[in-house]
Structures are given as structure tokens and as C-alpha cells.
Regions:
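Bacterial N-terminal signal peptides
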Residues: 8-16
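Positively charged n-region of N-terminal signal peptides that target proteins for export
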Residues: 1-8
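Sec-dependent signal peptide cleavage junction
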Residues: 15-34
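Conserved beta-alpha junction segments in alpha/beta enzyme cores
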Residues: 45-134, 141-278, 283-285, 289-304, ...
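Ser/Thr-rich, Pro/Gly/Ala-heavy low-complexity intrinsically disordered linkers and tails
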Residues: 32-43
Length: 482
């Protein structure tokens, strides 16, 4: 009996030793929490690597349509690249997360949702952490066109965005921040809405007509130019610039060449004279054009304006002060914009005009039904199909003393200035044409006077001010948590 017991004990010990040597049945099974943590660690290994501390990176991709023609607007097709257009990316990291700021030499970000999705998938960066800001350049591929040539361009464009994002992230370098401001001189930009001696309000490019003389501008032009410079040791500094003026004047209305308008010379000059990397972010330019024949100082055109702005940027950098970095704070807020109501009769008239193919007949019907332009006809039809409200996504990103507030529309200059004045941050960039394209967003004052931008706006009076207030609310909350 004892012999049998000893044999059983020996066999049990042998089995235990075998189990230990093979690693079987000796480890405590993972708890669900431990399993989840392990999966999380595995996933984090696939995410974009983030360096410690505050750092910035820069990259740029040429997105010009080389070798093929491309539609620029309803009447023009470009077949030559006079000056390259670019997708520029500035990456900002606080050591824990990354934000990407894109400056795009295109008219608008109509396909902002696609841009966000594509680059987020390529980099792992959340969509909320990105600004895609158009410079509002009118001399590039038409982002709203559905033609095959523009589709061809978009395919290359999306690849360029992903590459620029990855390269900017790879370029992340420890950085210090400096902020500066300077005013552009008289004549560099002006409010394109004004009152004539007969009391009527006018705008766009009607300055030199035979109509009654201009007696007053609707508001003063916002001339402030803002810079954020990232000093990066042995690597080139990055200078981000925020100013406001339509990039819509290169060559002529029947332009057939690609260029970035005044931003071409602006970029070239800053990078040559300051030996930095440059990124331009369009401000509240909905009612602001550059240059004006009514000012004492006259500029020859878009190329000279770009060169003049180089000196303004240099002055802003000369005026700069050190700024803190701090943690990235990122908020996306979506406002419900109340859509303007259209009468059934007005919609019927617009559709009748839209069905007409002959320009002469269109003009006759527009005159008959008191439509100011074909743009108003399109806006009436679109508003009728939009429902009661439409979402307006507002993105705000801040770090230390610096804040960025975006708008997916053409914000008016007075609203942009109001936003910056109300922001608690020492430096605020207000970026229009960002992450979407909702057309013009006139100020409440402009609604009172009427005109082209009001005729084509999709939303009710006061929506622009609502967006300003919401952005200020977010930035105030961010500032309190710095």
C-alpha cells in the first residue's frame, strides 16, 4: 500500500515538473482588464510616434495639375502652371497628441469631410485635430466641379495631403514660440462693400463705374497681420501668417493659368528674406479684397501686393514676443444654422431660370423676376432643399498663448476682428474656409444693407455672430484650463 502511494506521489511530482518546463498550466489566466490593457498596448504600437515635449514640423507638397488641363471655374480651363500651388502642413505636438494645420492653395474646402477622413486614416490623427484651410485662391482647380479633369486632380491631391501630413509629423522638432503683429499699409486691402452718393449700396468690383461716387465703406478694413514663429534650433523656423483678403485677382476673369495669386510672391519673399518655412492661413476675407483704386496709394496688382506683405510680415516678426506652449486643447462644436426660408413662388421662378440654356433668356428672366445674379438663382434653389437647419462645424485648437478658431464659410472682416478682440488669448488666428464650404456668412450690418453676399447666403441674419460667440466661448473655456 505504501509502495503504491509513493509511486503515485512520484508520478504527480513528475507531471508537475513537466508542466513547469513546458510552460503549461502554470500561469494565472489573464483577467478581462489585463487582456484589454494588452490589446491597448498592441494598438498604441501602431499609432504615430509622438516625441516628448513641445515640437513642430513642416512639409509641403506641390499640388499643381501638371500635364493636363483642369477646370478653374464655370468659364475658364487652365492649361498652364504659371506658379505652383501647394498643400502645406504644419504639425504641432505637445508630447501627448498632435494637431495638423494645412494651408491649401485652393478656393475652398468643399470636400473637407473627405480630407479629414483620408488624412486621419493615413496618420491615425483624430479628425478633430486638423485644420484644412483654403487660401481662397481663385486661380487653381475648381474644388466644386464634378468634371473628370478635377476628379483626376483630386486623386493626386489626396495623396499629397497624406504625404505632407506624414512628412510634417516626421519633421517634429523641439520648438519655442514667438508671436507678432503688424498692420498692412493703406491700399493693401479694402472692404468691397460701400455706399454711393445716391444712398445705394454696392460692392465687388464696381468702384470705377459711371455710377454715383462712393462716399463711405460699410466698415473699416481689417489690416492686422498676425505671425506665429516656431524657432527650431538647427532646423528652419516655421512662420505661420494670418491675414485677410480675397486671393481672387490673378491675371483676369478669363484666366487660363495656375497660380496662387498674391500668396505666390508673399511666400517666396518671406522664405527668401527670412530663411524660414512659410504657411499662410486665410482670415475673415468674405467682404475684403486686396488693393483699391480709390486709395491714394495704388498698387499694380496681385504680384506687388504679395511683395508688399513680405515687409509687413518682417515687421510683425520684429515686433514679436516670446509665448508659452502648454498642452494642446481641441474642441469641435457643431451649431445648427437656421436656413433662410424661400417662398414657393420664388423657388418656382429660380427653377424656371435654371432650366433655360440660353444666356440671353436667363438674363431676361432674372430681370423679370428681380434676381441679381445666377448665383442668387442657385442659392434660392439650394436653400429650398436644405431643410430648416444645416450644421456648421467649428473647430478650435489652442496651445499656451496661441489659439486657432475656424469657420467653414466666408466670414466677414468685422466678425473676424470681433472674434480676435473677444478671445482671451494673446494670439488668435481666425481661419475662414476651413474644414468645409458653406458660402458667404455676412455680418448683421451687411444684411441690413443687402447685396450679392446676402443674396447668396444660406443662413439667417445673425448666424455669423452666433458662430463668433460660440468660438469665443470655447476659447475662453480653453484659456481657463491652460
Amino acid at each position: 500500500m505504501k509502495k503504491t502511494l509513493y509511486l503515485l506521489l512520484a508520478l504527480s511530482l513528475l507531471l508537475s515538473l513537466c508542466a513547469c518546463s513546458s510552460g503549461l498550466a502554470t500561469e494565472t489566466p489573464e483577467t478581462p482588464k489585463e487582456t484589454a490593457e494588452k490589446k491597448s498596448e498592441d494598438a498604441s504600437d501602431k499609432k504615430t510616434s509622438i516625441p516628448e515635449g513641445f515640437s513642430t514640423g513642416f512639409a509641403r507638397e506641390d499640388v499643381s495639375p501638371y500635364g493636363y488641363s483642369v477646370r478653374m471655374n464655370s468659364t475658364s480651363v487652365a492649361n498652364t502652371v504659371k506658379d505652383p500651388i501647394f498643400a502645406t502642413c504644419v504639425a504641432v505636438s505637445d508630447g501627448e497628441q498632435i494637431a495638423l494645420f494645412f494651408s491649401l492653395d485652393i478656393r475652398n474646402t468643399t470636400k473637407g469631410a473627405q480630407m479629414l477622413s483620408i488624412v486621419s486614416k493615413a496618420t491615425g490623427i483624430p479628425k478633430e485635430n486638423m485644420f484644412f484651410t483654403a487660401t481662397h485662391n481663385h486661380s487653381g482647380p475648381d474644388p466644386t466641379a464634378s468634371t473628370s479633369d478635377v476628379a483626376h486632380w483630386y486623386a493626386d491631391f489626396y495623396k499629397a495631403l497624406s504625404k505632407a501630413a506624414k512628412d510634417a509629423i516626421a519633421d517634429l522638432t523641439p520648438s519655442e514660440i514667438f508671436i507678432g503683429k503688424a498692420d498692412s499699409p493703406a491700399g493693401t486691402n479694402f472692404v468691397r462693400r460701400y455706399q454711393r452718393a445716391d444712398g445705394s449700396w454696392d460692392g465687388i468690383h464696381n468702384e470705377n463705374t459711371s455710377k454715383a461716387p462712393v462716399t463711405a465703406y460699410e466698415t473699416e478694413a481689417d489690416k492686422e497681420l498676425r505671425t506665429v514663429r516656431f524657432e527650431r534650433g538647427d532646423k528652419k523656423d516655421i512662420v505661420m501668417v494670418n491675414w485677410q483678403a480675397h486671393a481672387a485677382h490673378a491675371l483676369s476673369s478669363n484666366n487660363s493659368v495656375i497660380t496662387a495669386d498674391f500668396i505666390t510672391n508673399f511666400r517666396k519673399g518671406v522664405e527668401k528674406e527670412m530663411d524660414v518655412n512659410f504657411a499662410y492661413f486665410q482670415g475673415a476675407a468674405g467682404d475684403i479684397n486686396f488693393s483699391s483704386h480709390m486709395n491714394d496709394k495704388k498698387y499694380d496688382g496681385w504680384e506687388e501686393i504679395g511683395s508688399v506683405l513680405v515687409d509687413v510680415a518682417k515687421e510683425a516678426v520684429d515686433n514679436e514676443t516670446p509665448a508659452s506652449s502648454g498642452k494642446l486643447q481641441i474642441t469641435k462644436s457643431v451649431l445648427d444654422g437656421v436656413v433662410r426660408k424661400e417662398s414657393a413662388e420664388r423657388v418656382k421662378q429660380a427653377k424656371e431660370i435654371n432650366k433655360t440654356s440660353l444666356d440671353s433668356e436667363k438674363s431676361a428672366l432674372m430681370s423679370k423676376y428681380a434676381f441679381a445674379s445666377r448665383y442668387e438663382v442657385s442659392a434660392v434653389i439650394k436653400r429650398a432643399g436644405m431643410g430648416d437647419t444645416s450644421p456648421l462645424p467649428l473647430y478650435c485648437i489652442s496651445f499656451g498663448d496661441v489659439a486657432f478658431a475656424s469657420a467653414p464659410f466666408e466670414m466677414f472682416g468685422s466678425n473676424g476682428a470681433e472674434l480676435r478682440k473677444a478671445s482671451p488669448y494673446p494670439m488668435t488666428f481666425n481661419c475662414s474656409y476651413t474644414n468645409g464650404a458653406c458660402g458667404y456668412m455676412p455680418s448683421a450690418l451687411a444684411f441690413d444693407h443687402g447685396g450679392y453676399e446676402i443674396d447668396t447666403c444660406y443662413f439667417e441674419k445673425g448666424t455669423g455672430e452666433r458662430c463668433v460667440n460660440e468660438s469665443v466661448r470655447i476659447l475662453t473655456e480653453h484659456f481657463s484650463k491652460r
